[in-house]
C-alpha cells in the first residue's frame, strides 16, 4: 500500500467513526414511555453555576451527558417572557409575549401535554408558583393574555390532566363569575387537597393539589420540600398508566430572584429545583423507559459571577437588568432519545423532539 492510499484509508476510517451517530445500547428502548420536562424559570448558565457553587461544588444536573442550547426570542421581541417561551416549548410555535397556548393570531395551539392525552398517556403539571401562572398555563390553557388567571383555571376543566400541584387556589374558588372550580373538579373525579402532607399520601387517581391561595412562598420562607415532594407524588400517580405519561415540573422562583437581583434567593431556588431534578433522574434510572429533559424558558437578571467559594458555599453576583435577557439557555437530557437534544436550536424544536421521542407522527 503506497502512502497516498494509506492516508486515504485512514481519512475514511476517521470519517466513518466520527460521522455516524452512536448506536443505542441494546437495553435502551427505541422510544421512552414517559417524558419528565423540568423548567427552571429564569435559569441561565450563571444561575446554575451559582447554585453549584453555593452547594459546595455539585448539582444533580452535572449527571446529564447530553447538553444543548436553545434560542429563546418570541415572535415579537428579542426578549421573551414566560408565556411566549412556554408556548413555544409546549406547542412548537413562536408567539407574542403574553400569549398562552395561542399563535400570534390567537389561534389555539395543541400542546405536547394535550397530544399525550390524546394518545392515552397520563399527564401532570407541578409548579412552585400558581399553577395558573404563565409557564404551567402554556401547557394546558389557551388565552390571549397571561393575566387572565380565572380563564386559565377554567381551561383545566377542558382537559383530562391527571395531576396538577401548585398554588393559585383563589383562581379556582374566589372567582368573579361565582364558580367554584374545585367542586366541578370533584365531580370529574379529582381528589382536591390543599395540604402538601396529604397530597404526598396520594398514589393513584386524579389529583388537584392547590397548595397556596396565590403563589407558594419562597424556599427560605417556609415552602420546604414542596417541589421535590410534589414531583415524586406526580410521578407515582402518573406511572399507574401503562401507556406512559408526560409531566412538566417548574421551579418558578429562580426567575423572581433574578428580577430582584437577589443572589441568595436565586441559589436557594436553583438548589431546590435541582433536588426535583435528582428525583426525576432517580426515577428514570430505575425505570429505563423515561426521558428527562431540563431547561429554562429564559435567563433573568443578566447575572454575572464576580467571586465565590466552593468550600464556603458563597457566591458574589452582579446584574445587568431587573428583567429577562435574550441569551441562549442550556438543555440537559437523560434517557432514551436524549442524544437528540444536543446542539443549538430554537426553543420550538423541543416540542418536535418530544413528539419524535414518543414516536408520535401528529403535529
In which residue ranges do the predicted regions lie?
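Metal-dependent active-site segment of extracytoplasmic phospho-/sulfohydrolases and closely related
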Residues: 45, 271-310
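Gly-rich Lys/Arg/Thr-decorated short loops/hinges at beta-loop-alpha junctions or inter-strand turns
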Residues: 92-97, 208-219, 255-261, 332-336
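Functional beta-strand-loop-alpha-helix junction segments that form "active/interaction loops"
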Residues: 103, 193-231
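Short amphipathic alpha-helices and their capping/turn segments at secondary-structure boundaries
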Residues: 113-117, 198-200, 231-241
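Active-site His/acidic residue clusters
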Residues: 134-139, 213-218, 222, 231-235, ...
Amino acid at each position: 500500500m503506497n502512502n497516498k492510499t494509506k492516508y486515504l484509508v485512514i481519512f475514511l476510517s476517521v470519517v466513518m467513526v466520527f460521522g455516524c451517530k452512536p448506536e443505542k445500547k441494546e437495553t435502551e428502548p427505541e422510544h421512552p414511555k414517559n417524558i419528565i420536562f423540568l423548567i427552571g424559570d429564569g435559569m441561565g448558565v450563571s444561575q446554575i453555576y451559582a447554585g453549584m457553587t453555593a452547594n459546595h461544588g455539585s448539582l444533580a444536573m452535572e449527571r446529564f451527558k447530553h447538553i444543548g442550547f436553545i434560542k429563546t426570542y418570541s415572535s415579537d421581541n428579542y426578549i421573551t417572557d414566560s408565556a411566549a417561551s412556554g408556548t413555544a416549548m409546549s406547542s412548537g410555535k413562536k408567539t407574542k409575549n403574553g400569549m398562552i397556548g395561542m399563535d400570534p393570531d390567537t389561534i389555539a395551539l395543541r400542546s405536547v401535554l394535550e397530544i399525550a392525552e390524546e394518545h392515552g398517556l397520563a399527564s401532570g403539571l407541578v409548579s412552585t408558583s400558581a399553577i395558573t401562572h404563565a409557564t404551567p398555563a402554556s401547557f394546558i390553557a389557551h388565552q390571549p393574555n397571561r393575566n387572565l388567571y380565572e380563564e386559565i383555571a377554567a381551561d383545566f376543566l377542558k382537559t383530562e390532566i391527571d395531576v396538577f400541584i401548585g398554588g393559585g387556589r383563589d383562581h379556582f374558588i374566589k372567582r368573579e363569575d361565582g364558580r367554584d372550580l374545585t367542586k366541578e373538579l370533584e365531580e370529574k373525579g379529582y381528589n382536591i387537597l390543599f395540604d402538601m402532607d396529604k397530597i404526598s399520601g396520594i398514589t393513584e387517581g386524579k389529583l388537584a393539589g392547590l397548595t397556596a391561595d396565590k403563589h407558594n412562598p419562597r424556599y427560605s420562607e417556609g415552602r420546604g420540600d414542596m417541589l421535590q415532594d410534589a414531583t415524586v407524588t406526580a410521578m407515582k400517580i402518573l406511572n399507574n398508566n401503562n401507556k406512559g405519561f408526560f409531566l412538566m415540573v417548574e421551579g418558578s422562583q429562580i426567575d423572581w430572584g433574578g428580577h430582584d437581583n437577589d443572589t441568595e434567593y436565586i441559589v436557594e431556588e436553583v438548589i431546590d429545583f435541582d433536588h426535583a431534578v435528582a428525583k426525576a433522574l432517580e426515577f428514570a434510572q430505575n425505570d429505563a423507559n423515561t426521558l428527562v429533559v431540563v431547561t429554562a424558558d429564559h435567563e433573568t437578571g443578566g447575572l454575572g459571577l464576580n467571586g465565590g467559594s466552593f468550600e464556603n458555599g458563597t457566591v458574589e453576583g452582579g446584574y445587568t437588568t431587573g428583567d429577562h435577557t435574550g441569551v441562549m439557555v442550556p438543555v440537559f437530557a437523560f434517557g432514551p432519545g436524549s442524544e437528540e437534544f444536543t446542539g443549538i436550536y430554537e426553543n420550538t424544536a423541543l416540542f418536535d423532539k418530544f413528539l419524535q421521542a414518543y414516536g408520535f407522527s401528529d403535529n
